[in-house]
Regions:
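C-terminal beta-strand-loop-alpha-helix "lid" module of Rossmann-like NAD(P)-dependent dehydrogenases
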Residues: 1-310
Length: 310
């Protein structure tokens, strides 16, 4: 049976750990708020860029850019570059484990393809490097000061590998932030870029209730004209310029999502650790009181027994 001194020492150690986990939870909560704000600021830009690209796609040759070459979709025996985004630290629940498992599953489910890896984050790098995988790109200490330039470097490495013919496709594996309690693993193709809306859009959109909208009304009940953009320079030049930027934006979005998901997972893990520490302190305190009560009772019995012997 441990002594009272040992129990008090354990209680002090658990309380010290609880203070650390509470502080880490507060720091993660603060950084999560900033990460959420950055996601909200980036989404309108990504949405408008996609809108412009969809408009440009109706005015140019769909095969005019090599990053749209669907014929380079990975085939049996083809080569894939898989970017895996993890964190540099632990204490974040299953954040790193889920990304690593998703990447490992992707590799196992594509036995006919040669998979090279681009590793973002120390945890993923350490895991795959120890197992002898073909690592083409690595970057660590990214979430500490995440900038758009980080996404540009990753996108540049992906585009160069794809356009040089080193790989047939590029995929991203990352944690998507949905809420503080929920993060979802995403495995999505980055290159070749999934085909945009190349169908020429109608210059008018049917109003709700019209026959074209499925409302059963007259066919020409009313229409709302769509905006037809005038481009300067030419649509072809803009399309060629914006396609690589679109790749950068998608990578940046994945980094922002992972950044927010990491802090959400860390905040949840530290909150759980703090609550577990509180329960452990309560249990140790109760046990300490029982041990002390037993010691007092034993001493009383010894005193009474000694008095009876006299």
């Amino acid at each position: 049976m441990p002594s009272l001194l040992d129990i008090r020492r354990r209680i002090r150690a658990v309380k010290s750990t609880q203070q650390i986990t509470k502080a880490m939870k507060m720091v993660a909560a603060s950084r999560l708020r900033r990460a959420q704000e950055r996601i909200q600021q980036a989404r309108p830009f990504a949405t408008e860029m996609l809108r412009v690209l969809n408009s440009l796609a109706t005015r140019v040759d769909p095969g005019s850019h090599p990053l749209l070459d669907e014929r380079r979709e990975p085939r049996a025996g083809g080569k894939v570059l898989l970017f895996v985004i993890t964190a540099d630290r632990g204490l974040c629940g299953s954040f790193n484990t889920n990304a690593i498992k998703a990447a490992s599953t992707f590799i196992v489910e594509n036995p006919g393809r040669e998979v090279a890896l681009g590793l973002v984050g120390r945890r993923g790098r350490d895991y795959f490097a120890r197992r002898g995988f073909d690592v083409r790109y690595e970057q660590v200490n990214l979430f500490q000061a995440l900038q758009y330039g980080h996404a540009q470097r990753i996108a540049q490495a992906a585009v160069e590998a794809f356009t040089n013919g080193d790989v047939d496709s590029v995929y991203l594996v990352y944690n998507e932030f949905r809420s503080v309690m929920s993060q979802r693993i995403v495995v999505e193709r980055l290159l070749p870029i999934p085909r945009l809306d190349f169908e020429p859009p109608s210059l008018v959109s049917p109003k709700p209730g019209s026959e074209a909208a499925g409302g059963g009304g007259p066919q020409n009940a009313g229409t709302t004209p769509q905006i037809d953009y005038l481009y300067e320079p030419t649509p072809e030049e803009l399309f060629t310029t914006l396609i690589p930027r679109h790749v950068e934006v998608q990578v940046y979005r994945a980094l922002l999502e992972s950044n927010a998901a990491f802090y959400a997972a860390q905040m949840t893990a530290m909150d759980s650790a703090s609550r577990n520490a509180a329960e452990m302190i309560d249990g140790l305190t109760l046990y300490m009181n029982k041990v002390r009560q037993a010691a007092i009772t034993r001493e009383i019995i010894e005193v009474v027994s000694g008095a009876g012997a006299l």
